[in-house]
Amino acid sequence: IVFTNADTSYVKKILKNLDLINIFDDIYDIERMNFLPKPNLQTYKKLIAAYNLDVKKAILFDDIPQNLIPAADLGLKTVQVYNKKLLKELNGTSKKIDYMTNNLKEWLQKWMLNN
């Protein structure tokens, strides 16, 4: 499931560009969040309830460190997708980050092979 502050049409373009369009089952976008974006904790809780997610088996990827904090607090694994600029912004959120990558597609491929 893609959990995004963007709209579905934009996300589909990005996923297609990254050749990840067939990896995800659904998109939980800003409209489905009732325009209450991440990192609002209630939005994460609604996502978990909407899909009956087992947080112990769920992973949240995000390029914004602050969006990983509520996910970690709820028990999800977290992956920081970064570039050099974002590395400077981590400021203490690293305790809430389980993994880091600068290549989402590569990370997903490795994860899927090993799990």
Residue spans for each PLM region:
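Asp-based, Mg2+/Mn2+-dependent phosphohydrolase catalytic module
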Residues: 12-115
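Conserved phosphate-coupling serine/threonine residues in phosphotransfer and NTP-handling enzymes
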Residues: 4
